[in-house]
Amino acid sequence: MQPDFWNDKRAAGVPNEIDLSAYKSVIEVFERSCKTFADRPAFSNMGITLTYAELDRRSAAFAGYLQGHTDLKPGDRIAVQMPNVLHYPIAVFGALRAGLIVVNTNPLYTPREMRHQFKDAGIRALVYLNLFGSRVEEVSKDTEIEYLIEAKMGDFMPAAKGWLINTVVDKVKKMVPAYNLPQAISFKRALHMGAGQALIRHPVTLDDIAVLQYTGGTTGLAKGAMLTHGNLVANMQQVRACMSQLGDDGHPLIKEGQEVMVAPLPLYHIYAFTANCMCMMVSGNHNVLITNPRDIGGFIKELKKWRFTGLLGLNTLFVALMDHPDFKSLDFSHLKLTNSGGTALVKATAERWQQLTGCAIGEGYGLTETSPVASTNPYGGKSKLGTVGIPVPGTAMKVIDDNGAELPLGERGELCIKGPQVMKGYWQQPVATAETLDAEGWLKTGDIAVIDPDGFVRIVDRKKDLIIVSGFNVYPNEIEDVVMAHPAVASCAVIGVPDERTGEAVKLFVVARAQGVSLEELKTYCKANFTGYKVPKHIVLRESLPMTPVGKILRRELRDIA
């Protein structure tokens, strides 16, 4: 379907097109916002707030260090391997201003995963938090990394408090394993060296690569998606357009310089990178960075300090928050936007969230390869639970059969996406690029979807996750959605396993809530809710499920142990 199919289906206030010529690069977006909103808060973390003016100054200092004290050239790759701390936006925007390509790196990567990414991307510089120094020491000698910039948690605090925080993290909590990296320069020292240095402005076009974003690894060895300045600027504008939906007061939902957006999802993940780093910045809004969202008690304690208006999360995080006894004591009176992405939103979770907070969760859909947002639900009562909404402005979608032919509305097939946010390709992987992107620019997602006649898109499942039982198709998401509605189930996952009689059988893994649940209870529940071939033949109770650091359940690992 072409983009104009959705023109009469958008919420009031949401435009059908975006102006792709509005900005020349991510750098221009950043610098314009820092000037326009100079006195407004940009990022807060651990009791410290950076204004846009301070972010501008410190990122310029970091760029000055990179340009004046290293021999890094425009187009060289720099890895940024940090959780949600204030160093992150300073390093990322500083690197971009210096003309470098940013490679977002998960700080929880194993040495094997770090080696793969650093070698594949040809990393020449790495910014990391000292908590991960031992892993950096282990892998740096096997890579081409020449420059190490080491950050510490207390870097932006007053001297005495910063020293205390760094000492507690290292000596008391024992969070810093021993390592020896004498060649590393401290982040604070790099900023000091680069401060006041005139920036050399290298020409940057919308077609130049801004970020190498490695795919999550749920599908095997990670590949680097080449996201250009044009991709990121377009997706920022697309998401901003959706946030311009008119509220009940007749004004745009997201107002410039007035929002407090909570950022528990890691900024190194493309979802939070675009939504928090890019979208909130262009509108002059305030991101509250949550460094460790797994500490739910600490997360809720931080939420109590803010009159937050928006929250980006995903299903597992929403469940963990709602299960905490202090969640109900929070003030949700200002919350007007809750977005879910990264993994399927379970109906029971969405209904419970709205009941407890008064704010509906808007589910969207995206991929690393689409920078990442491809579709979103309208906000409020216009949201359609069980769908991922409609394509963001300027985006076309279609579903195809196994032969590549486009299917009519209402039929399920592989979802394909076309738009200005679609990646340039995979870094140094022309074969993988050709398999994913066709000559007309359509991206094959590998997801099975249905485009309903009203224009809303439903993701049925990943192509490879499809289970075929005696010739019947079983979609894991359907089983998981229903099982999650059981009051004693905290989380679950479904895979297909070989079966001599039926070809494949459904295997269900369940993590129970505190009150527990028996296998017999689950079997009875499934038989009451599913037709015969969908009923799990095998049910396993577990204490936990393997997940990515972002909270996406790794079915691949469950298959390995099945």
Segments (PLM) and residue ranges:
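Conserved ATP/PPi-binding loop(s) of AMP-dependent carboxylate-activating enzymes
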Residues: I390-G394, A405-T436, V474
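Conserved pre-ATP/AMP-binding loop-to-beta segment of ANL
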Residues: A178-Y214, L221, L246-V260
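Gly/Ser/Thr-rich phosphate-binding loop
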Residues: N285, K305-L312, M322-S383, A396
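AMP-binding/adenylate-forming catalytic core of the ANL superfamily
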Residues: H116, Y128-N130, G419, K424-G425, ...
